[in-house]
Protein backbone atom coordinates (compact mmCIF):
# COMPACT_ATOMS: atom_id res chain seq x y z
CA UNK A 1 0.00 0.00 0.00
CA UNK A 2 0.89 3.64 -0.22
CA UNK A 3 2.59 5.47 2.62
CA UNK A 4 -0.11 7.56 4.31
CA UNK A 5 2.19 10.59 4.62
CA UNK A 6 2.80 10.57 0.87
CA UNK A 7 -0.92 10.34 0.14
CA UNK A 8 -1.65 13.28 2.47
CA UNK A 9 1.17 15.30 0.91
CA UNK A 10 -0.35 14.53 -2.51
CA UNK A 11 -3.78 15.74 -1.34
CA UNK A 12 -2.23 18.88 0.13
CA UNK A 13 -0.42 19.65 -3.14
CA UNK A 14 -3.59 19.10 -5.15
CA UNK A 15 -5.68 21.11 -2.72
CA UNK A 16 -3.32 24.05 -3.10
CA UNK A 17 -2.74 23.89 -6.86
CA UNK A 18 -5.91 22.70 -8.59
CA UNK A 19 -7.58 25.71 -10.15
CA UNK A 20 -11.27 24.89 -10.24
CA UNK A 21 -13.96 23.91 -7.80
CA UNK A 22 -14.88 21.04 -10.11
CA UNK A 23 -11.37 19.58 -10.08
CA UNK A 24 -11.24 19.73 -6.29
CA UNK A 25 -14.70 18.18 -6.04
CA UNK A 26 -13.58 15.30 -8.28
CA UNK A 27 -10.49 14.68 -6.14
CA UNK A 28 -12.56 14.75 -2.95
CA UNK A 29 -15.10 12.38 -4.51
CA UNK A 30 -12.30 10.02 -5.50
CA UNK A 31 -10.96 10.02 -1.95
CA UNK A 32 -14.47 9.32 -0.67
CA UNK A 33 -15.04 6.48 -3.14
CA UNK A 34 -11.73 4.96 -2.06
CA UNK A 35 -12.98 5.07 1.55
CA UNK A 36 -10.40 7.68 2.49
CA UNK A 37 -12.35 9.98 4.78
CA UNK A 38 -9.21 11.78 5.88
CA UNK A 39 -8.28 12.59 2.29
CA UNK A 40 -11.79 13.79 1.57
CA UNK A 41 -11.74 16.07 4.62
CA UNK A 42 -8.28 17.43 3.79
CA UNK A 43 -9.23 18.29 0.21
CA UNK A 44 -12.50 19.79 1.44
CA UNK A 45 -10.66 21.94 3.98
CA UNK A 46 -8.21 23.20 1.36
CA UNK A 47 -11.07 23.96 -1.03
CA UNK A 48 -13.11 25.86 1.56
CA UNK A 49 -10.02 27.81 2.67
CA UNK A 50 -9.58 28.87 -0.95
CA UNK A 51 -13.19 30.11 -1.13
CA UNK A 52 -14.76 27.16 -2.95
CA UNK A 53 -18.19 25.96 -1.86
CA UNK A 54 -17.24 22.34 -1.09
CA UNK A 55 -18.42 22.09 2.51
CA UNK A 56 -19.91 18.63 1.90
CA UNK A 57 -16.36 17.31 1.56
CA UNK A 58 -14.93 19.31 4.46
CA UNK A 59 -17.77 17.97 6.66
CA UNK A 60 -18.62 14.51 5.27
CA UNK A 61 -21.41 12.45 6.76
CA UNK A 62 -20.69 8.98 5.43
CA UNK A 63 -17.47 7.90 7.14
CA UNK A 64 -18.61 7.25 10.70
CA UNK A 65 -18.87 3.48 11.21
CA UNK A 66 -22.15 1.83 12.14
CA UNK A 67 -21.96 0.43 15.66
CA UNK A 68 -23.99 -1.29 18.36
CA UNK A 69 -24.25 1.20 21.26
CA UNK A 70 -23.53 0.05 24.79
CA UNK A 71 -26.02 2.60 26.17
CA UNK A 72 -28.17 5.49 24.98
CA UNK A 73 -25.81 7.05 22.45
CA UNK A 74 -24.73 10.63 22.10
CA UNK A 75 -25.97 12.61 19.15
CA UNK A 76 -24.45 11.46 15.90
CA UNK A 77 -23.47 15.06 15.13
CA UNK A 78 -21.20 15.07 18.18
CA UNK A 79 -19.48 11.88 17.04
CA UNK A 80 -19.01 13.35 13.57
CA UNK A 81 -17.54 16.54 15.03
CA UNK A 82 -15.10 14.64 17.23
CA UNK A 83 -14.05 12.25 14.45
CA UNK A 84 -13.53 15.12 12.02
CA UNK A 85 -11.46 17.14 14.47
CA UNK A 86 -9.46 14.35 16.08
CA UNK A 87 -8.72 11.96 13.20
CA UNK A 88 -10.31 13.40 10.06
CA UNK A 89 -12.04 9.98 9.89
CA UNK A 90 -8.70 8.14 9.67
CA UNK A 91 -9.41 4.80 11.33
CA UNK A 92 -5.73 3.83 11.55
CA UNK A 93 -4.29 6.92 13.22
CA UNK A 94 -2.46 6.87 16.57
CA UNK A 95 -1.77 10.21 18.26
CA UNK A 96 1.49 11.12 19.99
CA UNK A 97 -0.37 10.61 23.28
CA UNK A 98 -1.46 7.11 22.21
CA UNK A 99 -5.11 7.81 21.34
CA UNK A 100 -6.26 5.35 18.69
CA UNK A 101 -8.59 5.19 15.74
CA UNK A 102 -11.40 7.23 14.30
CA UNK A 103 -12.53 8.69 17.65
CA UNK A 104 -9.07 8.73 19.26
CA UNK A 105 -9.73 6.43 22.22
CA UNK A 106 -6.99 6.03 24.81
CA UNK A 107 -6.23 2.48 25.97
CA UNK A 108 -7.03 3.35 29.59
CA UNK A 109 -10.39 4.76 28.47
CA UNK A 110 -11.20 1.56 26.57
CA UNK A 111 -10.33 -0.56 29.61
CA UNK A 112 -12.52 1.64 31.82
CA UNK A 113 -15.52 1.41 29.46
CA UNK A 114 -15.13 -2.34 28.98
CA UNK A 115 -14.94 -2.91 32.73
CA UNK A 116 -17.96 -0.65 33.35
CA UNK A 117 -20.12 -2.31 30.68
CA UNK A 118 -18.72 -5.81 31.29
CA UNK A 119 -17.55 -6.45 27.76
CA UNK A 120 -14.32 -7.94 26.47
CA UNK A 121 -11.58 -5.33 26.05
CA UNK A 122 -9.80 -5.67 22.72
CA UNK A 123 -7.19 -2.90 22.55
CA UNK A 124 -6.02 -3.98 19.09
CA UNK A 125 -9.57 -3.44 17.78
CA UNK A 126 -9.40 0.26 18.59
CA UNK A 127 -7.39 0.44 15.35
CA UNK A 128 -8.56 -2.67 13.52
CA UNK A 129 -12.34 -2.33 14.02
CA UNK A 130 -13.76 1.19 13.57
CA UNK A 131 -17.19 0.03 14.83
CA UNK A 132 -15.60 -1.15 18.09
CA UNK A 133 -13.73 2.16 18.43
CA UNK A 134 -16.97 4.08 17.90
CA UNK A 135 -18.86 1.84 20.33
CA UNK A 136 -16.32 2.44 23.11
CA UNK A 137 -16.04 6.18 22.44
CA UNK A 138 -19.80 6.68 22.23
CA UNK A 139 -20.36 5.06 25.62
CA UNK A 140 -17.58 7.09 27.23
CA UNK A 141 -18.83 10.35 25.72
CA UNK A 142 -22.41 9.57 26.81
CA UNK A 143 -21.13 8.88 30.34
CA UNK A 144 -19.37 12.27 30.36
CA UNK A 145 -22.53 13.94 29.00
CA UNK A 146 -24.52 12.50 31.92
CA UNK A 147 -21.80 13.30 34.44
CA UNK A 148 -21.72 16.95 33.36
CA UNK A 149 -25.46 17.50 33.09
CA UNK A 150 -25.67 17.55 29.29
CA UNK A 151 -23.18 20.40 28.86
CA UNK A 152 -21.45 20.03 25.49
CA UNK A 153 -18.44 22.03 26.64
CA UNK A 154 -17.90 19.89 29.72
CA UNK A 155 -18.71 16.67 27.85
CA UNK A 156 -16.04 17.44 25.26
CA UNK A 157 -13.43 18.54 27.79
CA UNK A 158 -14.22 15.42 29.82
CA UNK A 159 -13.68 13.27 26.74
CA UNK A 160 -10.55 15.07 25.59
CA UNK A 161 -8.76 15.87 28.85
CA UNK A 162 -10.54 13.47 31.20
CA UNK A 163 -13.27 14.05 33.77
CA UNK A 164 -10.76 14.67 36.57
CA UNK A 165 -9.14 17.52 34.68
CA UNK A 166 -12.57 18.93 33.81
CA UNK A 167 -13.60 18.93 37.49
CA UNK A 168 -10.27 20.62 38.34
CA UNK A 169 -10.97 23.36 35.78
CA UNK A 170 -14.48 23.80 37.18
CA UNK A 171 -12.97 24.42 40.63
CA UNK A 172 -10.31 26.78 39.25
CA UNK A 173 -12.30 28.75 36.68
CA UNK A 174 -15.92 28.33 37.69
CA UNK A 175 -18.78 26.67 35.88
CA UNK A 176 -19.52 27.77 32.29
CA UNK A 177 -23.09 26.52 32.70
CA UNK A 178 -23.74 29.52 34.93
CA UNK A 179 -24.67 32.74 33.18
CA UNK A 180 -21.93 34.72 34.95
CA UNK A 181 -19.19 32.86 33.04
CA UNK A 182 -18.93 33.16 29.27
CA UNK A 183 -18.33 29.69 27.80
CA UNK A 184 -15.91 31.13 25.24
CA UNK A 185 -13.82 32.68 28.01
CA UNK A 186 -13.90 29.40 29.96
CA UNK A 187 -12.55 27.44 26.99
Q: Which positions does each model-derived feature cover?
A:
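Catalytic glycan-binding domains that act on GlcNAc-containing polysaccharides
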Residues: 2-187
Amino acid sequence: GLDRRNVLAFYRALGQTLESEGELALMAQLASLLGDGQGEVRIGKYAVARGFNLYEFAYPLQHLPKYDPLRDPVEEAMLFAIARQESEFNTEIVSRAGARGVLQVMQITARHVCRQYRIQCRIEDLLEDPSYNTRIASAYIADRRDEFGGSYILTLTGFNAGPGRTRQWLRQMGDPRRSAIDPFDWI
